[in-house]
Amino acid sequence: MAASAKRKQEEKHLKMLRDMTGLPHNRKCFDCDQRGPTYVNMTVGSFVCTSCSGSLRGLNPPHRVKSISMTTFTQQEIEFLQKHGNEVCKQIWLGLFDDRSSAIPDFRDPQKVKEFLQEKYEKKRWYVPPEQAKVVASVHASISGSSASSTSSTPEVKPLKSLLGESAPALHLNKGTPSQSPVVGRSQGQQQEKKQFDLLSDLGSDIFAAPAPQSTATANFANFAHFNSHAAQNSANADFANFDAFGQSSGSSNFGGFPTASHSSFQPQTTGGSAGSVNANFAHFDNFPKSSSADFGTFSTSQSHQTASTVSKVSTNKAGLQTADKYAALANLDNIFSAGQGGDQGSGFGTTGKAPVGSVVSVPSHSSASSDKYAALAELDSVFSSAATSSNAYTPTSNASSSVFGTVPVGASAQTQPASSGPAPFGATPSTNPFVAATGPSAASSTNPFQTNARGATAATFGTASMSMPAGFGTPAQYSLPTSFSGSFQQPAFPAQAAFPQQTAFSQQPNGAGFATFGQTKPVVTPFGQVAAAGVSSNPFMTGAPTGQLPTGSSSTNPFL
């Protein structure tokens, strides 16, 4: 009897609990508004879902949560739930909660749900005591009722057709063409002015219709075709970035001092040409002479027309030699540095004295070119040799000769050291070595271009007395007269050109005194296989005076023997 009565009592309580769950305000979870609560929060008397029941157990202090379908309730618990419920709990625990000002958390994030429950139950942020809960609830109800009444007092907007019915006559507006008032016309004019800047004004118009005419200033905006109408601007900017205009400039625009009408060019036939013809051959390497040396004469700034005529004569005489020998083209080197004794050929690196041009360059005969294949190189000695007195580049005198690097005085002694006079070897003229200069011809000497001794230097800048194909190892040469590079001929007379001064900063010492290792002299092999006297120094780094005169024509061709 007692068990059945107890069972009947539990069934009765369960039925009452299910009836309370079916109430409208209890159909959702009190904490997260999820439909179908399955647990009951016996601490506050609310109905919650499964996820919120776990969060409520983790609060401090933990809430007592019971399952609706898996537990039994006593009579006191049922009465407690009947007195509370979600509606009453909302008035107590969320009495001060404002839906518009307070942020509702995202209940899908468990961390945010836990923080919201702590604010609600632990901190009692929106808590209202039960005795004041009904008063606060009534105030909220009155406020919400007044707002609802104000909202309902606003008439509902309905279409005109629903008010007039289907039988309402059609209303036609602007059927005629009444005259417009001045106010309307002015407003339309203002609208047309604003229409140009209104991006949304043409949305309702026909996209295929012809556009309205615009003003001239607007039509010409960003119209690049109108740039051609400015004649003055085009004429001013016609030559902008036009590199062809540089070809019409004067001789000063020729970069690097390329020859113009007043300068001697690389080819004699272009001497009298215009600047345009010279620019046409610019970077055309076929127009350069077949020579391995650079044309320093083109950098001259005070070259006279007499030099140009001399160049033309030399090129005319070279026509026969070019057919006779393949190296005849090297004869143009004579046109660079020589134009006669005391010539007016200027230098780009200094000021030269002016004197009338003397004799014309003498060209070797055709017989010498035919007898020796290297005879065409005869004019190479005219670059570095002279029949007149040797001159120094930096010693001022009354008469001036030509020089490449500065003022060239004539007739002055190049060095204060003594120089011995004697016949030049192989009939060669006095030396034009830019590193060794002397007042007169001397006997045979070493061909080292860097050696400074007391003998008159006869070696040219690049070894005038050496052979073109040196026979320094005892091989007899096949030619009779050794010259600067090759060939057998008599060197023509030209003014000496000493380009660099003699260095006298170090005292000259006897042979072998400066370095003990190189103190011994070595036998010098002559171009004809003969050993010269022991007094000739063959060390290129020693400075000393010879012990005696050497036989004519006995000079070393190997600077390291």
Swiss-Prot record:
GO molecular function, one term: zinc ion binding
Residue numbers carrying Phosphoserine: S167, S181, S362
Protein modification: O-glycosylated.
Region (Disordered): 170-193, 413-433
Tissue specificity comment: Expressed in the testes (at protein level).
Domain Arf-GAP per the UniProt entry, residue ranges: 11-135
Keyword hit for Transit peptide: no
Biological process according to GO: acrosome assembly; intermediate filament organization; spermatid nucleus differentiation
GO CC entries: cell projection; cytoplasmic vesicle; neuronal cell body; nucleus
Ranges of biased composition (kind: Polar residues): 176-191
Compartments (UniProt record): Nucleus; Cytoplasmic vesicle
Domain of life of the source: Eukaryota
ZnF endpoints (C4-type): 29-52
Entry-annotated residues carrying Phosphothreonine: T177
Observed effect of gene inactivation: Mice have a normal life-span and show no apparent abnormalities. Females display normal fertility but males are infertile due to a lack of acrosome in their spermatozoa.
Glycosylated residues in this chain: S367
This protein's UniProt keywords: Cytoplasmic vesicle, Developmental protein, Differentiation, DNA-binding, Glycoprotein, Metal-binding, Nucleus, Phosphoprotein, Repeat, Spermatogenesis, Transport, Zinc, Zinc-finger
Swiss-Prot/TrEMBL domain comment: Contains FG repeats.
Function: Required for vesicle docking or fusion during acrosome biogenesis. May play a role in RNA trafficking or localization.
Subunit architecture: Interacts with FCHO1. Interacts with EPS15R and EPS15.
Protein name: Arf-GAP domain and FG repeat-containing protein 1
Natural source organism: Mus musculus (Mouse)
